[in-house]
From Swiss-Prot:
Gene3D superfamilies: 3.10.20.30
Segments forming domain 2Fe-2S ferredoxin-type: 4-96
CDD domains to which the protein is assigned, alphabetical: fer2
Keyword Metal-binding among UniProt keywords: yes
Protein name: Ferredoxin
One Pfam family recorded for the sequence: Fer2
Binding-site residues for [2Fe-2S] cluster, renumbered to this chain: 42, 47, 50, 80
Cellular component GO terms held in the UniProt record: chloroplast
GO terms, molecular function: 2 iron, 2 sulfur cluster binding; electron transfer activity; metal ion binding
Family under the similarity heading: Belongs to the 2Fe2S plant-type ferredoxin family.
UniProt-annotated location(s): Plastid, Chloroplast
GO terms under biological process: electron transport chain
């Protein structure tokens, strides 16, 4: 089983951290295990509270039902149901960009 480095960034929130996440662990769950507080609500991929934007790397978020195709193409991700497929850099706290 592969482990990946997840780099989270948010200039507004003062976040610049990197942690390990296995390929079978949701990014939000791994962040919490590493002591990083991120916003969330449903934990089921049905809202946008936990939205991030992948700027490097790739994720599997096939369980999500909220983001549309255009948002997915732009790199938006729901961290509560996203598994890493590689090392990733993700901008956090981007929910407002979706609207």
């Amino acid at each position: 089983m592969a482990d990946y480095k997840i780099h989270l960034l948010s200039e507004d929130e003062g976040i610049d951290v990197t942690f390990d996440c296995s390929e079978d662990t949701y990014i939000l769950d791994a962040a919490e295990e590493a002591g990083i507080e991120l916003p969330y609500s449903c934990r089921a991929g049905a809202c946008s509270t936990c939205a991030g934007k992948v700027t490097e790397g790739s994720v599997d978020q096939s369980d999500q039902s909220f983001l549309d195709d255009e948002q997915l193409l732009k790199g938006y991700v729901l961290t509560c149901i996203a598994y890493p497929e590689s090392d990733c850099t993700i901008l956090t706290h981007v929910e407002q960009e979706l609207y």
